[in-house]
Swiss-Prot record:
This is Phosphoglycerate kinase. It is found in: Cytoplasm. SUPFAM superfamilies: Phosphoglycerate kinase. The gene is pgk. One of its GO terms (molecular function) is ADP binding. Its EC number is 2.7.2.3. It comes from the Bacteria. Substrate binds at D24, L25, N26, R40, H63, L64, G65, R66, R122, R166. GO terms for biological process: gluconeogenesis; glycolytic process. It catalyses: (2R)-3-phosphoglycerate + ATP = (2R)-3-phospho-glyceroyl phosphate + ADP. It is an enzyme of class 2 (transferase). Belongs to the phosphoglycerate kinase family.
Length: 408
């Protein structure tokens, strides 16, 4: 990645300069508005800390959830501002709007080392607009917040890896208006993904889970030609099992993808590995009674909610000799203790391979959440990404708009 980085910016000097940082602070909240996994907040700290300590006037923009282009109190960044302040060890102001009168007044009142978090950027419909001119108008308003008193432009730091695959105002368009730099997180993430795609030590094992084949089809197609083993679990495995002619009971099934899965199994028979046993239940609930059955013997009326111990053993054998591992997507409903063993077992196998020298990447999203929820050591993996969708699109071979614009 031939872009300027945060280190370059710090070397130039940021004392007294306005710096707009696009962070990824899209954290999960419970019904009471409490953050249940602060991973992304923690990951954003190094860049923000470095800028604040260097005397920049730091303005942070980020989103939370999917508001419909207007303010939604349930998706306010207020709890994030509090958590961010705690992690930074300094007060973080929260603007009452995105680029309105409160944001402007607070931006003008910043002193060196201050941090201001703008309200949820997706409260403004222009952020995600397909209309270039609408996005650009929001980008100009964001750029104006970091303009110097003498009219000199501020700078933009892209540090939200989880959104770099989106062509949005705060990710792409604002970078066309301001001097731009990759933050610590974005630079590290891209370096890891480049290592995965360019200098892969073999055997290379890919572990894919999650619910829908359609969401992972492009990455399956791409990685099946590169990996030595492609392990498939999670809800998506049932469409593959159906493609083998097995009954999957009331398990999650994408019938429209069965023929595609059959073709993939034919083309990559030596690469794709499916579960040999499944943990089933008669309902999707934490208190459901679990039963392990052979993968080709799922009873009618039962749904698969995890891979079984035989599958964990089989996948562990494949992973034990791997030199490179990419994992995206849980093996089962890890949020329910009765259906978490598959995800935990596979994760422990990856940790074991890492301990023997393998390079392992956890591809963000639910996988990263599972690592934390199941109490697994985060340093047991070489890298835990903050961007599931961005990681997958990169590995599909797609251009990421938020990275592409930094290279210009």
């Amino acid at each position: 990645m031939s872009v300027k980085t945060l280190d370059d910016l710090l070397a130039e000097g940021v004392q007294g300069r306005g710096v707009l940082v696009r962070s990824d602070l899209n954290v999960p909240l419970d019904d009471d508005g409490n953050i249940t996994d602060p991973g992304r907040v923690i990951a954003s700290v190094p860049t923000l800390q470095a800028l604040a300590e260097a005397g920049a006037k730091v303005i942070v923009t980020a989103h939370l959830g999917r508001p419909k282009g207007e303010p939604d109190p349930k998706l306010s960044l207020a709890p994030v501002a509090a958590a961010l302040g705690e992690k930074l060890g300094r007060h973080v102001q929260l603007a009452g709007d995105v680029v309105g009168t409160d944001a402007l007044a607070r931006a003008e009142g910043l002193t060196d080392g201050d941090v201001l978090l703008l309200e949820n950027i997706r409260f403004d419909a222009r952020e995600t607009s397909k209309d270039d001119s609408e996005r650009l108008s929001l980008a100009k308003a964001l750029a104006a917040l970091v303009e110097g008193p003498d009219g000199s432009p501020g700078v933009f730091v892209s540090d939200g890896f989880g959104v770099v695959h989106r062509k949005q105002a705060s990710v792409y368009d604002v970078a066309t208006l301001l001097p731009h730099y990759a933050g610590t997180l974005v630079a590290a993430e891209v370096k890891v993904l480049q290592q995965l795609t360019s200098s892969t030590d073999r055997p290379y094992a890919v572990v894919l889970g999650g619910s829908k084949v359609s969401d992972k089809l492009a990455v399956i197609e791409n990685l099946a030609t590169k990996a030595d083993s492609l392990i498939i679990g999670g809800g998506m495995c049932f469409t593959f099992l159906a493609a083998q002619g097995f009954s999957v009971g009331s398990s999650l099934l994408q019938e429209e993808m069965v023929d595609t899965c059959r073709r993939l199994l034919d083309e990559y028979a030596d690469v794709i590995h499916l579960p040999v046993d499944i943990v089933v239940a008669d309902k999707f609930a934490a208190d459901a009674e679990a039963e392990t059955v052979a993968a080709d013997r799922i009873p009618d009326g039962k749904m698969g909610l995890d891979i079984g111990p035989g599958s964990v053993e089989r996948f562990t054998a494949l992973l034990s000799n791997a030199k490179t591992v990419f994992w995206n997507g849980p093996m089962g409903v890890f949020e329910f203790p009765a259906f978490a063993a598959g995800t935990k077992g596979v994760a422990e196998a990856i940790i074991g391979a890492t301990g023997k020298g393998a390079f392992s990447v956890v591809g963000g999203g639910d996988s990263a959440a599972a690592v934390r929820r199941l109490g697994l050591p985060e340093d047991g993996f070489s890298h835990i990404s903050t961007g599931g969708g961005a990681s997958l699109e990169y590995l599909e071979g797609k251009e990421l708009p938020g990275i592409q614009v930094l290279e210009s």
